[in-house]
């Protein structure tokens, strides 16, 4: 994990720097990857809608929501600017080295066991699907001529931890 201060030291100046750089080079579109953590620590995050109340409870969620506001201010500073904000859940895929990759390694190595509620649903998605969704939403934004588009990205329905484990074991040939 990261120190709490690192989220603020990275996400807030990062947003400010990106917006300033975009102005300097006359870039008229920013795609910002935020997080569903802006909704708070709730198992219902997978069912949250884009207009759901944001109540981040972690430094990561707070810093990302603050960064969203910085990007929104950038967009509002010029009507020609376009902003696309995506709020993904846990993203997994090749070389991601996060929780899903650790779970795959543990299951394939036959040393995986559940330490929590197997029914907990994990909001998230595959990295290539996230990229495809961004391209789709850029086209949508252009077709509707919307200055700012914000959307959540998760599998629907969100699989449970047990669903993940069973699928990994099946694909990996582990019984």
Where are these regions (language model features)?
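Conserved cofactor-binding/catalytic machinery of classical short-chain dehydrogenase/reductase
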Residues: 13-17, 29, 52, 66-67, ...
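Conserved Rossmann-fold NAD(P)-dependent oxidoreductase catalytic core, especially the SDR/UDP-sugar
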Residues: 16-59
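Substrate-positioning beta->alpha
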Residues: 96-102, 116-139, 147-149, 163
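Mid/C-terminal beta-alpha module of Rossmann-like enzyme folds, strongest
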Residues: 140-175
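NAD(P)H-binding glycine-rich loop region in Rossmannoid oxidoreductase-like domains
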Residues: 1-10, 21, 39-41
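Short alpha-helix in the Rossmann-fold core of NAD(P)-dependent oxidoreductases
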Residues: 8-15, 31-34, 63-64, 123
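Catalytic helix-loop patch of NAD(P)-dependent Rossmann-fold dehydrogenases
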Residues: 9, 13, 43-92, 96, ...
């Amino acid at each position: 994990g990261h120190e709490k201060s690192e989220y603020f030291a990275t996400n807030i100046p990062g947003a400010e720097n990106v917006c300033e750089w975009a102005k300097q080079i006359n870039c008229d579109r920013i795609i910002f990857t935020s997080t569903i953590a802006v909704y708070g620590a709730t198992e219902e995050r997978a069912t949250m809608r884009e207009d759901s109340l944001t109540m981040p409870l972690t430094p990561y969620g707070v810093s990302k929501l603050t960064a969203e506001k910085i990007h929104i201010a950038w967009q509002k500073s010029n009507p020609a600017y376009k902003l696309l904000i995506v709020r993904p859940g846990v993203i997994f895929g090749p070389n991601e080295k996060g929780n899903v990759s650790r779970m795959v390694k543990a299951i394939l190595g036959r040393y995986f066991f559940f330490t929590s509620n197997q029914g907990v649903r994990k909001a998230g998605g595959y990295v290539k699907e996230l990229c495809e969704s961004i391209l789709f939403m850029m086209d949508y934004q252009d077709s509707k001529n919307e200055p700012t588009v914000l959307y959540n990205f998760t599998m629907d329905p969100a699989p449970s931890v047990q669903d993940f484990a069973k699928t990994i074991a099946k694909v990996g040939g582990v019984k």
